[in-house]
Amino acid sequence: MLSRTIDRSVLRLYNTGLRTYAQAAKKQYDIVVVGGGIVGTASAREILLRHPSLKVAVVEKEHKLAFHQSGHNSGVIHAGIYYKPGSLKAKLCVEGLHLSYKYFDEKNIPYKKVGKLIVATNDVEVERLNDLYKRSLANNVPDVQLVDAKRIKEIEPYCQGLKAIWSPHTGIVDWGLVTEYYGKDFRQAGGDVHLNFEVAKFEESKDPNYPIVVKSKRNETVQSKYILTCGGLQSDKVAELTGCSPLPKIVPFRGEYLLLNPDKCHLVKGNIYPVPDPRFPFLGVHFTPRMDGSVWLGPNAVLAFKREGYKWSDINLFELFDAIKFPGFIKMALKYVGAGMQEMAKSALIPLQVKELQKFIPDVQDYDVKRGPAGVRAQALDNDGNLVDDFVFDQGKGDNALAKNILHCRNAPSPGATSSLAIAKMIADKLENQFNIK
C-alpha cells in the first residue's frame, strides 16, 4: 500500500516535471511583459515576488535592459513637487520616492541625496513659485521649504535668486543600474528575460491555456495567458498591434545636455531648476550633478527625427512623417511655435543655453561647457494637441484574447523612474484584479 502511494507521488512529480519541461521548451508563460525598461522590469519583478509560482517573462528588443529612456535620463530622484494634486503622478512619485530610497539602502545601490532648489529670479517667477509651493504641500512632498536669497546662498554658494523652493529629499542615482538590479531580482525569483526579441505581432493561439502568441521579427515565439506591455517610445505601436486605439500618440522629443567642464563642477552642489513657465510643456534648462561627479546642463527639447534618434543625424523618414502628419502634433506645433523655434536655436547655439544658465550661476561662461549626451522622451499627445500628462492604461476592444488578456501601459513619463516601484505595485494590482490572479 505504501509502495503504491509512493509510486503515485513519484508519478505526479514526474508528470509535473514533464509539463514544466514542455512549457520551458515551448516558452509558455502565465504572464509576458513586453518592454525591458524600468517600468516593465519593475512590474515583472513585483508580480513574480507576489506570486512566485507563476511563470513570468520579459521580452526586450535591445541587447540589454534599460537601453532607451530608462538609461538615457538625468538620473534625478524626484520628490513630487510639480504634479497636479490628486493625479497618479503626484501620488506615485511621493510613494515611489520613499520606496526607492528604501530599496537602494537594501541593495547598497549608490545614490546621493543632494536636494533641489527651484529658483525664482524675478517677481513674476516668485508668484509662480508660491503657487508651486502650495502644490508641493498638497502633494505631501517631504520637508519641502520656501527659502529666501540668503538661504539660497547657504545651500548653493554660487547661485543667485530672490526666492526658492528647497527640496532636501530630491536626489540622484543611475536609473539604468537600478533597472539592472530589478532584473537581477526578477531572474533570481525564477523569471526569464529574452533579449533581442523585437515584437512583430500578437496572435491568438489554438491552445486555450496559453491563448496569445507573441512573435518576434526573428520569428521567435513565446506563448502566454496574459500580456502586459510597457513599450516606452514604442508604446502606441505595440498597442496598435493588438487592435488598440492609436491614441495617445507617441511623439519623440530629444533632450540635449551640455557638460560643465570638470574645473567648474564645484559651482554646483545639488539640482538647480528654474521656475517652470505654465505656458510651456517642459521644465527648462537646469543644473544636474551626476553620480560620477560630472554636471549636466539642460536639457532643451526638440523634435527627434527618429523614435530612437539621439543625434540630429538620426533620421527615419517614415517615423518622422508619421509624427508630423498626426493632427495632434500639428495643433501642438502651432500652439508652441515660438517656444519650438527657441528650443531649436538653443540646440544649435550653445551661448543661448549658457545665457539661460547664467541667470542662476553667473560664473558659468561659454567656454566652460561642451556638448554632452542626449535622451529621447516619449511624449504622449491626444488628437487636440494636448500633452497627456499622466499615466495611461488601456486594453484592446472586443471579446477576443487579444482584448481580454492584455494590459497596456501607454504612458509612463517622468517621474516614471522615481515612481517605478509604486507603478509596479499599481500594475500588479491591476493584473490581479483584471485577470483574477490569486
Language model feature labels by segment:
Residues 327, 332-438:
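C-terminal catalytic lobe of FAD-dependent flavoproteins
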Residues 165-226, 230-237, 421-432:
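Helical element adjacent to the flavin cofactor pocket in flavoenzyme catalytic cores
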Residues 42, 202-316:
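Flavin-dependent oxidoreductases
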Residues 84-95, 119-128, 166-185, 194, ...:
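Short beta-strand to alpha-helix junction loop
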Residues 48-71:
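Glycine-rich FAD pyrophosphate-binding loop
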Residues 266-373:
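Active-site lid/adjacent beta-loop-alpha segment flanking the redox-cofactor pocket in flavoenzymes
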Residues 75-151, 155, 161, 284-285, ...:
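Dinucleotide-binding Rossmann-like beta1-alpha1 core, especially the glycine-rich loop
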Residues 25-39, 57:
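Beta1/beta-strand and adjacent pyrophosphate-binding region of the FAD-binding site
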